[in-house]
Amino acid sequence: MKYDFTEIEKKWQAYWEQHQTFKATEEPNKPKYYVLDMFPYPSGSGLHVGHLEGYTASDITARYKRLKGFSVLHPMGWDAFGLPAEQYAIKTGTHPRLTTETNVANFKSTLQRMGFSYDWSREINTTDPGYVKWTQWIFLKLYEKGLAYVDDVPVNWCEELKVVLANEEVDEKVNDGYTVVRRPLRQWMLKITAYAERLLTDLDEVDWPESVKEMQRNWIGKSVGAELDFYLAGTDEKFRIFTTRPDTVFGATYMVLSPEHPLLDKITTDEHKSAVAAYREEAERKSDLERTGLQKEKTGVFTGSYALNPATGKEIPIWTSDFVLMGYGTGAIMSVPAHDERDWEFAKKFGIPIVEVIKSPHSVQEAVFAGKDSVCTNSENAEISINGLAYEEAFEKITDWFEKKGLGQRKVNYKLRDWLFSRQRYWGEPIPIKHYEDGAERAETELPLNLPEVSAYQPSGTGESPLANIAEWLYGEDEHGKFRRETNTMPQWAGSCWYYLRFIDPDNPNEAVSPEKEKYWMNVDLYIGGAEHAVLHLLYARFWHKVLYDVGVVSTKEPFRKLFNQGMILGEDNEKMSKSRGNVITADSVMSGYGADAVRLYEMFLGPLEQVKPWSTNGIEGISRFLGKVWRLVYPNEADGTVQVTDDAPSETVLRRMHKTIKKVGEDTETLKFNTAISEMMIYVNELQKEKCRSRTAIENLLLMLSPFAPHICEELWQALGHEESITFAKFPEYDATLAKDDVVTIAVQVNGKLRGTFDAAAGLSKDDMIAEAMKVESVIKFTEGKEIVKQIAVPNKLVNLVVK
């Protein structure tokens, strides 16, 4: 019987759907495992082989955990609001909902062809009214807690898209060639800053890649420092700055205000007004990222005014520069060029004095010294001296002095800014707020508030969405009076902030999620997706989760226990897959040629899951041959189609290899080392072929190990071996530790604790024999010859240590 992957895969996909094989249930007597993919935005271009990597990894884990006796939740849905569908609507007039439905059907078809074991009964779509209702409900919880508010803020305005971008989105859009400028606009903000410390400290509770944790820590940007007051020279007026290095205040030789600082107009002298105004206008056109880049050329304008350094009493010039942001600290800084790289470059460019106040190993006129591992110098006045003090002691002493004089206080600052939440687009969740003629603001009482139909999708360009043009939707009257609805919509991030909760209870009309189901399934045990979401989706979702924890909706502090970032699969040319490069390999085309099982195995066999690696269509041929070998273990003669398996016990050789394979595959699958698990199964299959093994035990255990990776062929062969129930409900085999031991082990030989050689020996060699063999190792003899051996230590199967004198 021939291995016909096309028919076999269709057969088993239909079987799984008909029997709802992967339907998740809450079973109190079983451990649970919640494995989740970052659900996709259903774009028009469909899925290529790179997209499938993370989905394949999560599916292997889900199938493996079922075999290990877990009740598994493995859902899939669609993050379906978003700009691309709206841009397409603007061009073609096609409603974004229709475009999205077509794209979802295309995506779903590919995922089903891959044999992923999703519980499709839990499928969700962020644009469905039943889902929008609860996204809006969560927004109102934020609103009730004072965490959602309106403000006129300088925003990142993209002229081409006619939309406001969150700080976190600017970099991507600029790289895509869009122009982003700063302009003030009425916006909805979410007070994520209120959760900054919790977002920071709770990172210690999750099993995430350290690189992602570090990205979040840097984005939150906690700075411990002090706020200090500086007087304007010749006045009684003072202004406050924030610094993380109050110990360097004696070296402050100039001040810098943000171009948006409210004091700037007041202090700028007449002769400098036009230059300052022009500079401010230029700064408004730049994003925060452009303004603060360390590599950018330092620019600035002198205001004509001076401040008094409170430590030295000297007048120092006040400048304005765009690298100081109004949103961080106080929007004003003291500049210590000797000990800060940016300040040093600025001072050098504009001829400002540089004064050493931290003892440096070189001249600070030639290069900056920014280290903390030295002591203060040139840092005293009539009231205080911090000379000779190291950083921490100097920090405390000078800050105490400022506090006693009423000129400062200790302060913790965060770089994290409140989340700019509103969008001036049509295709998003309407913000459920009504604005009344008397100035009052009230929440919508009937949710969901659905989007109305519109005839044109173009953003207005005025700061309002196309919803502002739908009078019958926009205006209304209730018992409180006449109102106008909010025309801003939510960003795409809103729906993805909590979708993992809705998967737990997708059809509940009365609650976002029932407490009983939430307690059973949360948190997500394994979350797989790209590292590019580190400071966007992952931070936002953690914020919403903490709010939901505070209002009693969830029982866990964190949503995702373990996070794994898969590496990118490149095109065959070693470049990122993209239409423009013409190197995209679609998932459907490869499946048509080789079958889903081969694609799944090859995706995982390419290399470690976390690494970047190129695709090779030639490479999948080897995987295809491997599956042919597996098939022929059960059907050795294609012509007669008879199962040729015996009930004979495996030979000793096969038995040992089988137990080693069970051990290795189990351990590697647990730790997501899928490439080495597959290698081990290949070795096992070769052993079975070599030994001409037809043992049912040996072959069934192979199918159980292989089924999470290549489920269709394993289901077919499992059935051929006489099993009526899906292999999904079988149990992963257990290994015998004695039989799984290596036959040969490498023993390290140390002399006085230093490695001097190794030798190979049979596993289980006695301690005396280990010591005897160690004494024969040539590289060891020269360290023991002519010396007294005072102690001999042997650790079975590992090492021998000889102590000599």
Swiss-Prot record:
Family from the record: Belongs to the class-I aminoacyl-tRNA synthetase family.
Enzyme Commission numbers on file: 6.1.1.4
HAMAP family in the record: Leu_tRNA_synth_B
Keywords: Aminoacyl-tRNA synthetase, ATP-binding, Cytoplasm, Ligase, Nucleotide-binding, Protein biosynthesis
CDD domains from the UniProt entry: Anticodon_Ia_Leu_BEm, LeuRS_core
Positions bound to ATP: 579
A Gene Ontology cellular-component term: cytosol
EC class name: ligase
Natural source organism: Chloroherpeton thalassium (strain ATCC 35110 / GB-78)
Main location as per UniProt: cytoplasm
Gene3D superfamilies (UniProt xref): 3.10.20.590, HUPs, Isoleucyl-tRNA Synthetase, Domain 1
Primary gene name: leuS
Compartment(s) where it occurs, according to its Swiss-Prot or TrEMBL record: Cytoplasm
MF GO annotations: aminoacyl-tRNA deacylase activity; ATP binding; leucine-tRNA ligase activity
Source organism, top-level taxon: Bacteria
Protein name (Swiss-Prot/TrEMBL): Leucine--tRNA ligase
Catalytic activity as recorded in UniProt: tRNA(Leu) + L-leucine + ATP = L-leucyl-tRNA(Leu) + AMP + diphosphate
Coiled coil: none
Leader peptide range in chain numbering: none
